[in-house]
Structure formats: C-alpha cells, structure tokens
Amino acid sequence: ELVLVNFHLEAYDDGEGKVAQTRQLVELMKAEYRKGNYVIAGGDFNQTFAEAAHIGGSWEGKWTPGVFAEDELPHYIDLVYDGTRPSCRSLDQPYTGDRKNHAFYLIDGFLMTDNVKLNHVETVDLNFEYSDHNPVMVQVTLQ
C-alpha cells in the first residue's frame, strides 16, 4: 500500500514540540515501512534543512527556524526538498509581492522511504499569491 501523511509541525515554539512530533512521525513511517508499505510524508517542518542556504530576505527581528536533525533519520528514510526557491515567507506584515521587507524560508518538503524513487522535486514559485507558502511537488516511482 501507499501511505501518504500530510503534516504541519509546531511553529514558533522552543523546538521541543517539533522534535517530539518528528519522532512520532518517523515512528509511524517505520511501522508502515516494516509492513512493506511505501511511505511519503509531506508538509511544513517549521525547520530549515542543513544543506539549505539562507534563501533570501532579512531575518533580522523575525522568526528564525531551527535546523531539522536529518542525521537522526533511519538510513531508509530520505529527506527531500527543493533547495533553489523559498517555500515560505514571513507573516509579520501584509505581503504585496515586494520581497525586500520579508524573510524567506525553506521549511517545506517530504520524508520518503527508500522503496519510493524520487524522480523530481520542485517548489513552485507562485510568489505567495494564495498563502504564506509556495507549493512543493514531487514526482515519484514506487519500487
């Protein structure tokens, strides 16, 4: 079976909530993988990723995300994201499309078990027209 999980980890906390939620998510993925299932979990980590550079805008005086602990994942679960475009913008003021007064983050992506082959991942730059997040898409093959 294909198991899809949509998640939104805790925001604006000291990090403990996200750590606990991530552990719970990984335990769910491990249990489903042991059953022989394909598992894809996608959503808002509210954490950035170690290899993702500061993606733009000024973070001064704004929320700063923690870093996702990718090294704590089991070897058969991969972290997948598009490191070329921001997936989220700051919410401290209305967004009019002018990027100079906002902070931008890369905090959205996927966790996938190794029986799911990644073909493509892309953050679609909609300039935050509909949300404070841009959509992130994946194309995969179940192996």
Describe each PLM feature range.
Residues 1-6, 116, 140-143:
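Beta-strand-turn-beta hairpins that frame and shape the catalytic cleft
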Residues 1-19:
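Metal-dependent phosphoester/phosphodiester hydrolase catalytic core
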Residues 5, 103-107, 132-136:
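Residues that flank catalytic or metal-binding motifs in active/ligand-binding sites
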Residues 7-9, 43-45, 134:
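Active-site metal-binding loops of divalent metal-dependent hydrolases
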Residues 14-17, 127-132:
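Solvent-exposed loop/turn segments connecting transmembrane beta-strands
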Residues 14-115:
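Metal-dependent phosphoesterases centered on the DNase I-like endonuclease/exonuclease/phosphatase
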Residues 110-112, 137-141:
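Short, well-ordered beta-strand micro-motif
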Residues 116-127:
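Low-complexity, intrinsically disordered Gly/Pro/Thr-rich segments
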